[in-house]
Amino acid sequence: MKGVILAGGNGSRLMPLTKAVNKHLLPVGPYPMIYWSIMKLQEAGIKDILLISQKEHMPQFYKLLGNGEELGVTITYQVQPAASGISDGLSYAKRFTKKESFILLLGDNIFEDSLKPYTERFEQQGKGAKVLLKEVDDPERFGIAEIDEKNKRIRSIIEKPEQPPTNLCVTGIYMYDAEVFSYIEQISPSKRGELEITDVNNLYIENSQLTYDVLSGWWVDAGTHESLYLASQLVHQALRKGQDEK
């Protein structure tokens, strides 16, 4: 299985920190944010990684990461001309993934769990897609999943619902088969002019092919000043705990 990391966008919610640097290069604990996605993939045995971002950010990423050798992976770079949505960014991974299944990470998602058990279950699934969910206290802020717990399927995904059916938000951790690229071709830009990943996931739902797992550890979308600070706190706590257990 290959890995794809989306690391684009202008990081407007993290201004002025992102005025001169891509948000995925900001520190989270002792490392740049982008390291965490790469290390999670590497720990799960996924070492062939595509990093997607805008052209102006690529020199910074390449200076930091090079070909990935220092982190035990192989990194390929792909330009997304404009930050036009997750599905648009993902569409540029088609040549890299070929006809293989793969895992997609949003580079600002910092989380505790190992990816390995989830990727193994997805490989056993054989086809379709899987998303990882997380219980949250403020479901009105997220895309929320209505689930069929018996069959481990997602019935629907509702963006920022006023009356959430559950408190299970869709995180930025997705697994797809090669069919995803034909689904991307079928969707249209949203009101904000972007190709939304929820529209792609809904096509999988229509075919009863979107499964889920729920993260057991902590998870943070580190896209704001508050959540970036929280992610650093949680990372430092986890590192201290690991040192204490040695």
Swiss-Prot record:
What is the protein's species of origin?
Bacillus subtilis (strain 168)
| Transmembrane segments annotated in the record for this chain | none
Q: Which PANTHER family match?
A: GLUCOSE-1-PHOSPHATE THYMIDYLYLTRANSFERASE, GLUCOSE-1-PHOSPHATE THYMIDYLYLTRANSFERASE 1
Regarding protein family, the annotation reads: Belongs to the glucose-1-phosphate thymidylyltransferase family.
Cofactor(s) recorded for this entry are: Mg(2+)
Give the record's keywords alphabetically.
Magnesium, Metal-binding, Nucleotidyltransferase, Transferase
List the Pfam families hit by this protein, alphabetically: NTP_transferase
Gene (UniProt): rmlA
Residues annotated as binding Mg(2+) are D108, D221
Q: What is its EC number?
A: 2.7.7.24
What name appears for this protein in its UniProt entry? Glucose-1-phosphate thymidylyltransferase
Q: Which residues form a coiled coil?
A: none
A single BP term in Gene Ontology: biosynthetic process
Pathway participation: Spore coat biogenesis; spore coat polysaccharide biosynthesis
> What are the GO MF terms of this UniProt record?
glucose-1-phosphate thymidylyltransferase activity; metal ion binding
The keyword Nucleotidyltransferase is annotated on this UniProt entry = yes
For this protein, the record's InterPro entries field holds: G1P_thy_trans_s (IPR005907), NTP_transferase_dom (IPR005835), Nucleotide-diphossugar_trans (IPR029044)
Function, as annotated = Catalyzes the formation of dTDP-glucose, from dTTP and glucose 1-phosphate, as well as its pyrophosphorolysis.
Catalysed reactions, semicolon-separated: dTTP + alpha-D-glucose 1-phosphate + H(+) = dTDP-alpha-D-glucose + diphosphate
Q: Which domain of life is it from?
A: Bacteria
Q: Report the co-factor binding details.
A: Binds 1 Mg(2+) ion per subunit.
